[in-house]
Amino acid sequence: MNIIEANVATPDARVAITIARFNNFINDSLLEGAIDALKRIGQVKDENITIVWVPGAYELPLAAGALAKTGKYDAVIALGTVIRGGTAHFEYVAGGASNGLAHVAQDSEIPVAFGVLTTESIEQAIERAGTKAGNKGAEAALTALEMINVLKAIKA
């Protein structure tokens, strides 16, 4: 039986982070968590991290796809926050971001880590950006690094 598992240490990884400006008071914490995980745990060098800001979560798939197509990156991390309001807008934005990012990963065959919070309230978002529920930006970064190594092992 062959079992493929991988660790997250990836010192030579080239990683792009695309991040939404909308709700940046939360997204800034996601970004801090992602960068900390990349550098401290993944051992990724500063010069191998690119950050691309977009207006909102709905624009993340387009930027992630453009980054993936360059061939310069081993993974893309998408960060953003969508908070439910009183209209159906939440479903459209959250669904569009989620489905779009999944398509980018499948089409590009590089990891696209989903670090987009979809919450019922600002309080829930804050909890997931570094307080009670950990930092989902850091978790997305670790997922990206592990998947880089998993794909390398599969192709080896």
Swiss-Prot record:
- Key words, A-Z: Riboflavin biosynthesis, Transferase
**Record's InterPro entries?**
LS, LS/RS, LS/RS_sf
The protein's enzyme class: transferase
Task: Name the residues that bind (2S)-2-hydroxy-3-oxobutyl phosphate.
Answer: G86, T87, R128
Report the Gene3D superfamilies cross-referenced here: Lumazine/riboflavin synthase
Q: Which GO terms describe its cellular component?
A: cytosol; riboflavin synthase complex
Q: Name one GO molecular function term.
A: 6,7-dimethyl-8-ribityllumazine synthase activity
Entry's EC annotation = 2.5.1.78
Q: Does the keyword ATP-binding apply?
A: no
| Catalytic activity annotation | (2S)-2-hydroxy-3-oxobutyl phosphate + 5-amino-6-(D-ribitylamino)uracil = 6,7-dimethyl-8-(1-D-ribityl)lumazine + phosphate + 2 H2O + H(+)
According to UniProt, this protein's pathway is: Cofactor biosynthesis; riboflavin biosynthesis; riboflavin from 2-hydroxy-3-oxobutyl phosphate and 5-amino-6-(D-ribitylamino)uracil: step 1/2
- Tell me, in a sentence or two, what this protein's role is: Catalyzes the formation of 6,7-dimethyl-8-ribityllumazine by condensation of 5-amino-6-(D-ribitylamino)uracil with 3,4-dihydroxy-2-butanone 4-phosphate. This is the penultimate step in the biosynthesis of riboflavin.
Regarding protein family, the annotation reads: Belongs to the DMRL synthase family.
NCBIfam families xref list: lumazine-synth, PRK00061.1-4
Enumerate the HAMAP family for this protein: Lumazine_synth
Protein name per Swiss-Prot or TrEMBL: 6,7-dimethyl-8-ribityllumazine synthase
What is the source species? Escherichia coli O45:K1 (strain S88 / ExPEC)
The record's gene field reads ribH
